[in-house]
């Protein structure tokens, strides 16, 4: 029999009760869905190229620091996922731990993050297909969007099966390429620290932001918690494992390319928007490059599947709680079809419109930076959620006794440090990013506040109208 739960938000509105989705994802499925959301190989060829442009030979350091930032936030979200196992992820955490209004704003920003982050991978895939094979950019985007949308509409289980097969293949490709760079470098290794003086350290915050965009793909798993078997244990473990594996592999592979560049004396930091592809082709040949591109495009499909699924589950729960139109929470054959169709349309619209207006790599960078800023925003909200919950638990436990207090006390500095690190990188990234990306980011925040205010005013108006009717 299908396992179902009832999620009751803290609004006291009994009409908001809703049956959640069937739990059918095990640990392996969840890991590879989240790993697919990271898309390490495509991330290395796209986000990695952007980090290289900013940081040069310090790129592995920026990637490692980006992974550390994501890991801090990941530990916070892990603790929250142990407490909240229903659908919705970051939105659900803020909705229950902080307030309905903050939850709405967090869900609003998560939609911005997840749609733009997924569309960035569509743009990255389109760029690589155009760069290597000469395919028109819009055709390349459609080649990613159509199969990914089909998988999403088929359901989370078929998507997870595809993610497992594709993820194993990708792991083998990444490890093989790294070992190949080590072999070609004759097992010599360079020290990134010796290049600090020649690096553009003023762009370090932006380099960390882009570096963090690779492992931050783990954020696709939290919204699907309601479909994970034994979510209280599985989701948190998967988050940390995916961050370490995905971020570690990305830093390792970029280091391998940089190491080969240093040892061989062959620079590749000026090769347009695809230095890694160019360098790979130079050393491994065109046939191997085609294999790399195939794996990267497969990554684009994986990332789009993971984040389209995550976006639709967030919309589904927001509709169920009536902070967005309730129709978004309707189920058909056990799937949130309205939410899924809404997100699929958004992916097609954003990807194609941006690629019509901008060059593919520029579109990727724009979408990537804007989504990364939003990622920091929602993680600050998650950190605040854990901070408040931990303070409340400490207060309760001190009043009744000190048993099991140590782990809760440890959550407070964890949330504080993660918030400080995220806020610092957010501020410095805003100051160093291209202004138009920042304007779009803040415009979406303002739009969310306007929507929340309008909803609140209309809600009060409805209450007053009903009250007057009863008085009559």
Regions found by a protein language model. Name each.
Residues 16, 21, 60, 134, ...:
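Helix-loop-helix junctions that connect adjacent transmembrane segments
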Residues 177, 184, 370-378, 403-472:
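A generic transmembrane alpha-helix motif of multi-pass inner-membrane proteins
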Residues 91-97, 121-141, 227-231, 239-245, ...:
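Helix-loop-helix connectors at the membrane interface of multi-pass transporters/channels
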Residues 109-123, 220-227, 286-325, 368-369, ...:
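Membrane-helix boundary/coupling elements in multi-pass transport proteins
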